[in-house]
Amino acid sequence: MEQDKENKQSLPSKYNPKEVEEGRYQFWLDGKFFEATGDPDKEPYSIVIPPPNVTGRLHLGHAWDTSMQDTITRMKRMQGYDVLWLPGMDHAGIATQAKVEARLKESGTNRYELGREKFLEKAWEWKEEYAAFIRSQWEKLGLGLDYSRERFTLDEGLSDAVREVFVKLYEKGLIYRGEYIINWDPSTKTALSDIEVIYEEIQGKFYHMRYPIKGSDETIEIATTRPETMLGDTAVAVHPKDERYQHLIGKTVILPIVGREIEIVADDYVDMELGSGAVKITPAHDPNDFEIGNRHQLERILVMNEDGSMNENAGKYQGLDRFECRKQIVKDLKEQGVMFNIEERTHQVGHSERSGAVVEPYLSTQWFVKMDPLAKSALDMQADADEKVNFVPDRFERTYFNWMDNIRDWCISRQLWWGHRIPAWYHKETKEIYVGKEAPADIENWEQDEDVLDTWFSSALWPFSTMGWPNEDSADLKRYFPTNVLVTGYDIIFFWVSRMIFQSKEFMNEKPFEDTLLHGLIRDADGRKMSKSLGNGVDPMDVIEKYGADSLRYFLMTGSTPGQDLRFHWEKVESTWNFANKVWNASRFSIMNMEGFTYEDIDLTGELSLPDRWILARLNETIEQVTRNSNKYEFGEAGRHLYNFIWDEFCDWYIEMAKLSLYGEDENKKKTTRSVLAHVLDQTMRMLHPFMPFITEEIWQQLPHEGPSITVSKWPEVNSEFDNPQAVQEMQRLVSIIRSVRNSRAEVDTPMSKQIKMLIKTENEQLTAELEKNRDYLERFCNPSELSISTVIEAPDKAMTSVVTGAEIFLPLEGLIDFDKEIKRLENELAKWTKEVERVQKKLSNQGFVSKAPESVVEEEKRKEKDYLDKQAKVKTRLSELK
């Protein structure tokens, strides 16, 4: 269709991201361009967004993650797919509850005073508030999400899926209730998942003790970082092949302070080389000890309460806080002569991500998923080339295998109110357990389990629960599952990716996604992880405010390769803004020269100049490179090809050369150049659109175009008619000649405005004819007073000389410079660089310097040596040309 000329406006003279991006997102939403259509004539392509937590605003990592997904889905939509990018958010159990409780505390109340129902109302209010924040940030980033299908992990549909999965796994014996060692937060009094435990290196102590052997003068030496747990010791373990302790296996130790008799057991878990080779076993307070205790049927003695205070099993220490108990017990053991050494030691200690409290390995009755059968099924699927998930980069598949091969049962219950309440009820009299999707009919005789499920339980179902499962007749489930790619960070392979895979295998009998594209972490410019404590975090909205979403997105998309971390540099974002500004100015010039030009006017069948043929051929190559690399998720490479084509070729060379036709008198040439400009700019904006959606839509709307939005325009395809290796070769030679002349002029400080004689000696007549045909460009960009092109040119005396493929270029210097003065200046410069070369080489030949100086200092001196040698060589060449 013809472009509406009445609505057409030229681009403003200055690129202002705020003005460009303002209102554009609403235009896309109004056009419903992001909504999946279910068109049976199109192949479906789907992605589910990793649901951000409704705990606060999105950080830079979210911006990176979602920019990748948006780039992929925009490209696929343009390639003709029926694209579903499904948005949603995660209720984030403990994280959100902690935030809501903190807000309640500020208002002078707490969840217990409110009660469960009122507290959940407050939590839902929080969710609505922060969901609105998140949506506004998605809008600022320009994300093409299908909001008609937005999901939340506590939606009724997803809650139904959670209950269905829980009940089915329970009925298969894969969910059970039992005692196990869990990560316990004494501050919030809840179990934590492994990902909610942050390990920090602290300066602690290693306490060495001697336990007496019953009926003997012998003792056995053990060591611990948590002496308060000795009150719950029920054995000492040694390796069965450790000759030092063979005679003690089966004997009894008297536990100091407590006086309890505990056995010395033999277990392969013990490392003979570590410490004394004997370890205290506390099955209720250590996961490894728990396993050893199971193997040897040891008693489990819990010595702490849920709040971290010591309980009745701690004897005289009952009521003390665990750390106060540690101090007191150390004092008592020293007095008894049991503790003989305290060693300062740096070690890793787990802290709650939410409360900061030191996490306690704690014996608790919880709900668990039995993992071995589920892991085996998932691993069997991964071993099948046709059924497996493709990890990108593939090295992360090994990480996945390592985790699944060594997996432990999954503790899924949490002592919280915000979340999916466990669908289990206990009979008030018989204590019978009932598990079902619906409450028992005689509900008055039952009490529902107070706990909720681990957040990861519901997010593990995300790829299929969001599409209507357990309704297997759901149209979306049939069409869009399994999804095509999951984009997420490599740091949650264990906690999310693996769980989605085994739950999908269990309930859908297939993988949840074809590929999983794993990116790294965003770090600051010095490579440090961004954190509140370091104060080095960057709010993506601040970056957008300063440079616009397009600049931030392009930096994020091109700044790293799959699986690698990304360092954030404000300077690099500024450089992408410069790129956007370059695109804007080039487009503005082009559009200004297309007044009255319509989509139907584009005609590429006329006589094409060398720059026309070259830019069309290079466009072909760029389309191929950008498409191929993007399909492999190599967005950095795709962006590099696009950047080089736009900046170095289209802007710096083609547009400048196009001015000869645009400002000329030949109307046919003018129309052809306009057509090439319009076509190349249109195709380039389409390729750039997934990376920089706002600016490309703005420019595309001003170009002669067809269709309502670049978002739903067709992705560029290679046109074999424009393949032209000869034109590319000819243009490369022409550009090389122009560059060499400009460089030579700069070396003798001769501005382009001053005309100079120029001689080009070619190696054959064919090349002479080629250059003669392009004489206009040589004269326009080299500004010669006289231009001779021939195979028989003699090299003049005292001339600047440069060589390109098939030709030599001479610029006679007679009349341009004072030779004697220039020779003297160059000799002084040569002496200067020679002196610098000698100085740096003397330094590098000093073995004392090379061996003792930091590597970075030595490398800097080597860099200087190379730089000085290059400058010395150039000055020598120029002197030889003048003498």
Swiss-Prot record:
Gene3D superfamilies: HUPs, Isoleucyl-tRNA Synthetase, Domain 1, Valyl-tRNA synthetase, C-terminal domain, Valyl/Leucyl/Isoleucyl-tRNA synthetase, editing domain
EC number: 6.1.1.9
GO cellular component, one term: cytosol
Motif ('HIGH' region): 52-62
One GO molecular-function entry: aminoacyl-tRNA deacylase activity
Source taxon at top rank: Bacteria
Subcellular location: Cytoplasm
Catalysed reaction, written as an equation: tRNA(Val) + L-valine + ATP = L-valyl-tRNA(Val) + AMP + diphosphate
Role description: Catalyzes the attachment of valine to tRNA(Val). As ValRS can inadvertently accommodate and process structurally similar amino acids such as threonine, to avoid such errors, it has a 'posttransfer' editing activity that hydrolyzes mischarged Thr-tRNA(Val) in a tRNA-dependent manner.
Name this polypeptide is given: Valine--tRNA ligase
Source organism of the structure: Oceanobacillus iheyensis (strain DSM 14371 / CIP 107618 / JCM 11309 / KCTC 3954 / HTE831)
